Every structure is written in structure tokens, then in C-alpha cells.
Amino acid sequence: MKLSRREFAKANAAAIAAAAAGLPLASTASNLITEADMTRLDWNKAPCRFCGTGCSVMVATRDNRVVATHGDVKAEVNRGLNCVKGYFLSKIMYGVDRLTQPLLRMKNGVYDKQGEFQPVSWDQAFDIMAQKIKQAIAEQGPEAVGMFGSGQWTVWEGYAANKLMKAGFRSNNIDPNARHCMASAVMGFMRTFGMDEPMGCYDDIEAADAFVLWGSNMAEMHPILWSRVTDRRLSHPNTRVAVLSTFEHRSFDLADIPLVFKPQTDLLILNYIANHIIESGAVNKDFVGKHTKFARGADDIGYGLRADNPLEMQAKNAAKANTWEDMSFEQFAAFVKPYTLERTAKESGVAAERLKALAKLYADPKRKVMSFWTMGFNQHTRGVWANNLIYNLHLLTGKISEPGNSPFSLTGQPSACGTAREVGTFSHRLPADMLVANPKHRETAEKIWKLPPGTIQEKPGFHAVEQSRKLKDGVLKVYWTQVSNNMQAGPNVMQEILPGWRNPQAFVIVSDVYPTVSAQAADLILPSAMWVEKEGAYGNAERRTQFWHQLVKAPGEAKSDLWQLVEFSKRFTTDEVWPAELLAKAPDYKGKTLYQVLFANGQVDQFPSEQIEAGYANDEAEAFGFYLQKGLFEEYARFGRGHAHDLAPFDSYHAERGLRWPVVDGKETRWRYREGHDPYVEKGSGVQFYGYPDKRALIFALPYEPPAEAPDDEFPFWLSTGRVLEHWHTGSMTQRVEELHGAVPDALVYMHPDDAKALKARRGSEVKVISRRGEIRARIETRGRNKPPRGLVFVPFFDANKLINKVTLDATDPISKQTDYKKCAVKIELVSLA
């Protein structure tokens, strides 16, 4: 039956009215309802797949396909809004080149490092993986096996990977790509507070009187949070916004105090503000006396380069970078005294009046301050110091752990906090802030995991940058990466990463959804399920854990990373990967598979599939015969419950738009360390930084030190890399969305117009960006969103056709091991005028 638009509207209105009144429907209305049922959409909640903000979206599915999404109006984080990437979530899974079957490099029907990719079965793929790992462990020990994971792993994927590597293969060589983005934030928290993750939450935005952005372009990288900051600024005229960066970007549009500083001199500015607070009498003496102590950190700590690099050989304290000594307040005041307004203005290039206006925001006792930072701070050879120094300002003034007063580290990935940090998928960590080097922590993990003593190795494994070096050097023989694209995102691709991956001694496996640069450089590609093709959990920047159900099936033979990890564990018996002396402590485990020991261990497999909410698929439960996700989560939660990392019971999260840990007696925590908000703070104490036994936070004396590489006559420009609004990280998802790719198809070299003119170039000219390590070609942009000062260029890293990380330096913070992508020296050469 065909209806005109007018007839359709009338019939639809009749149907609604009749249904509301309980009346029988007219025949035309009945037909309409029947036809509508054929096009019915099923809507369910899920956290966004992109950044660490943790927006919730409503996902519409029909006929095993995601067909639409919109912002979740019930979500506290985004309140129904999405950024431009979020609006196109429904398209990220359906690129024409989606991987749907395992692919192995082969020649004449057998594996060959120089062969072409050919389809194989999952059994064939796992057979060669198992063969390579068994051979590597037998010949060289657990150190020969490594894994590179992700802040995009779901909580249970990261947890399963951690167990398989650290307990099953007994190798701590597992690290997430969050090493590139959040490791300095982690160590900043750990050094200052003795515990990781923010004390505040997004609610601080609506209570703050000032916002200070340190190396954070929130307008493009965290636009939903920026909309809340903007609303606060425009609706409360007394609110002020300060933005600090090495170049102007869109966040400067809202800035009352704009500050463009010379690279690395943020350390000078931070120490100047501390000095201003002291000299102006703005120290909160009562707070400082009760809740803090002072420490002098080691200096001259090197740059995390190879040991034979002259910069490392000259560094006096490279071996003890993460050490400090006690000092007094008076000694601290004397330490920061040389960081005067005059010196800071001269060396940073920022006008003195702007520096003073910034310092006054922190010093004013009547103004609540929220500090935000992301990669500008963290991707820094002194990123941990920068984190420590921003905490100094909040601690000296007592502006912390209360509504509106909040130093807040923003995250870039959806579960960099919930998986990489909280689960502990770093090479030196275990769940809930525990460390592999701590015997008590290893003992706790071994008890929870039901393992014999001594299973977990005490030596930290290779971190992300070191993994590339060890592949190149032939130390790592088997390397499995999941949910990451390090061949595009990692530093110094041509000298370190590519030679390592293509080392004839190495066997590299990539689990992904698209044929990324990394996949194309691998030996074996495994097709993965993504986002709502599996049941998942993420943890966002404000400690909010969010769950979602599996809503559709993955295409072809694609499988979730969780299935891959757990199914693969069946290929090994303990006799093949554990030494005899370890098995002697647990004779019942002899001959058992790692699957039986790690996953079918009476804990992980205790929840039957029947507990899955009716109406939802769960491919892993179907494969293994139990509710795997629930079992992994409840076992993992044992690490944190009772230790200020409390997670709610598993079933609570499917009913909520996320809960912020610690969750005690069903109540989430918005402000940590503050009495009345945090259940772990003792009554009458007001504030307790209970990460340390004395419940005091550390205020660090740390100096300015220069970057690892700076411009010179041969390479006269600074290079900074980063992102743009329309694309996320390496663009493997967003570049496959026609609207986003069409908006920004290519990475550009953002440059000051006068620098372009000096090169006899102009907007649109093609140039080479050349460093001591590699080069790329791209076109110049002298207008638009990013406005570098003279002597600096900015190039985003989303474009696989313009791999800017061929150019970058693999210098890292010696404490956090996080890469500095914001500072290296390049030269620019004109290719064509355009």
C-alpha cells in the first residue's frame, strides 16, 4: 500500500492517538505500524570509541549493522552532545578495506618473511604463532617475547593480555601505546601523591573561576569538555581562561590570557609561578604545613636515548632519575627564587604582564583554578617534572581536591585510564597501582591469580620505545600488537621501528580492523572485532568506568582481541613455557594449558552464560561456555577493592552511565582525598593524600633543563606534531569516514607566513620536512586553525601518506619513558611553488 506524505502523517497521528487511548487502529494505521516494524531501530548505550573524555552515545542497530548514533542525553559527561567525530561513529566499522580473515606472509605455500600476504585459517595463524613463541622461549627465555597493546583495549582485553604475558609467558615485555601519551601523567601522580589518576572530576568545570590550559588544545582534542568550559566562561563574566602553547590554536579564541612560549620553557614558567606565590605571600601555610612535604628531585637525568648516545653518556643521574631527597620549605623557596619574572619573560618569550596575570590566577585565594593538560606536558623529555610542577602550584595554595580547584590531566584514548593504567598493562605495573618490582605486589597478584610463588618476574619489561630497539637488536623475537598502529604513531620510524619489525629474526603479529601501516609491515595480520561488535568496558579521564553490550556481529572471520588472547592460550602447556623449579611448586599445574591455569581457573569461569542480559549476543561466552567478561572483571576488581581503587559489582555498570571509582557501598567518589567526599579519608582530617604512609603530598624542586635537540644553523626550525579535530590519532578509523576525510584529507605543514616567504614559498607550496632521521613531503598552510610563531612548524600525524614520525626523535622522559613528539629540529626545503 502506498501513502502520500499527508496520508502518512494522518495515519501516524491516528496510530499514536489510538494507542494512547487504548482504541482499535484503523486499517491504514495498522498497516503503517506493520511497515514501521520492518524498519525498527534498536537503541542501546555505549561510550564513544574515540578520546578519553568518555562521552556516552546511543547506538542504533538494524539487521546486524550500526546505522546511526547520537549523543546520550542521560549521560553526565556529554549531556547529549557529540563532537564531529562522534557524529560519524556509525561509519567507522564499515570501511571497504575491513580485514575479515587472517593473512600470513607466504611463498610457495609456507611462511616467508619476504612473502606476500595470503589468507590462512585461524588454526594456521595460531599454529605458527605458537611455534615461534615456544621456540623463542626455549632458546632465549621469556624476554624474547613481547606485546604492544593499547589504551583502546577494553578493560578485560587488557587484563587478559596482562595475565597471558606476565603470568603465562612470564614476560613483562608488555606495554600499551598509552606509554606515548599518559606515562608522564602516571609518574607525576605517583611521585606527588603516591597514587595514580585525578583527584577531581568534570564537575569541577562548573565550579571553577579560572581555567589554565598547559599544552592542551581542548577546543579540538576534547571539544565536549571545551563546550562546558566555554559555557562557564561566557555565563560567568568573572571567569578567566589562560592558554599556554608553543603555537596558537583554536583554544586561543577563548583566551583572556594567551601565552605562546618557546619550547621547553614551560618549566621556567611553572617555577616562576611558584616563586610568585611565595614572594606575594599567597602560600596557604596551614594547608602546606598539614598536608605536604618538600623534596629535591634528581637532575641531569638524560633523555632516554640509546645508552651509547653522547647525551646519555654525559648525564650524571640517568641511572637514578626517579630519586629525590627531603628538603625544607625554606630550601624550596630558595630554589625557585632565581626564577624571576624578568628571567622567565626573557627566556620564554612571553610578555612579562601576561606571565604576571597568569601567576595571579593561582595566587588569588578567592579564585578557584582548574588546570588542564595533555600531550604538551606529557610528550616532553621532562614531562614528569612538568606534572610535578603543576601540582606544586595547587598544593602551595591549597587549591586541590575540592569543587572547582583541580589539577586535571586529560587523556587521549577511551581507556588509557581504565585499561592501561588501572589494569596495569605497562611493562612495570600490575593492577591497581601495583608494581612488578615490589615483592608484596607480586605476591598479591600471584595469590589472586592462583599462581605458584615466583611466577611473575621482578624485573620490569621493555617499554614501548625500548621494544622497537630490542626488535632491531634481535633481542625480541616474537612481537604481538593489538589495537595500535605504532609504525605510524611511534617515533623515529626509519631508524628504529621499521628496521626492528623487518628484522629477519623477528616475527611480528598485528591484530587490527584495517590494513594500517603497521599491519602492512607485519608478518601475520589477525582480523579484529571492534567497538560494539563485542561486549566492552572503558575507563575515562575522571575515573568513570562504563560498560556496553555486544550489539552486532563482526564481519567475516574477525574476532575480538579478547577471544584471540584466550583462545591462543590453549596452545601452550605449563611444561612448555614454565621452568621445572616453578612447576615443582605447583605440581597440579603440570601438563595443564595456560587457558586452564589463567582463564578456566575456577574464578574467571565461575559465571554461567545465562547471566548475560537477555536479548544480547556474546560471542566470547558462546565460544568458551561461560560469561568471560564478568569473570575477568570480578577477578580483576579484587586488586582494588579495599585499596581505594574499588570498583562496583559487574552488573551495576550495565545499568549506569558509568561510575567514578572508588565506589564504596554503591556510592561513587567525585573528589578524592577530601573528607566528606572520599570514603578513605579519616574523619576530622579534612584532607589526606593517603597514597603515602604519612598521608602527605610531595612538592618537588625541579629545575629547567634544555631539550634533547634544538634548532641550529643546519636544522633551523622546531617541529611539533599532534592532532586535528576531524581525525583521531593515526586516522585508521576517521580516514575511512567520507565526511571526515573530505574535510581534512591531508596533513599540512602549518607555518608562519614570514617563514614561508623567506623560503620563497607560499600557502599550498609543497615542501620537504627534513630531520637527521628522515623526511616527508607535504604542503604548507599559512592560515587557518594553527598559527605557529616564526621558527616553528606543526604537522599532524593522522596521515599515513605523510608519516611525520619518520622525522621525529625517539627521546623520552627518563622517568616515564614517554616520547617527546613536540620538540625536534628540522629544515624545510621547497619542492614546488604550487
From Swiss-Prot:
The keyword Signal applies. InterPro entries: Asp_de-COase-like_dom_sf, CT_Nitrate-R-NapA-like, MoPterin_dinucl-bd_dom, Mopterin_OxRdtase, Mopterin_OxRdtase_4Fe-4S_dom, MopterinOxRdtase_cofactor_BS, Periplasm_NO3_reductase_lsu, Prok_molybdopt-oxidoreductase. One of its GO terms (biological process) is Mo-molybdopterin cofactor biosynthetic process. Predicted to be exported by the Tat system. The position of the signal peptide cleavage has not been experimentally proven. Its cofactor is [4Fe-4S] cluster; Mo-bis(molybdopterin guanine dinucleotide). [4Fe-4S] cluster binds at residues 48, 51, 55, 83. GO terms for molecular function: 4 iron, 4 sulfur cluster binding; electron transfer activity; iron ion binding; molybdenum ion binding; molybdopterin cofactor binding; nitrate reductase (cytochrome) activity. Substrate binds at residue 797. Binds 1 [4Fe-4S] cluster. Binds 1 molybdenum-bis(molybdopterin guanine dinucleotide) (Mo-bis-MGD) cofactor per subunit. SUPFAM superfamilies: ADC-like (SSF50692), Formate dehydrogenase/DMSO reductase, domains 1-3 (SSF53706). Component of the periplasmic nitrate reductase NapAB complex composed of NapA and NapB. This is Periplasmic nitrate reductase. It comes from Ectopseudomonas mendocina (strain ymp) (Pseudomonas mendocina). The gene is napA.
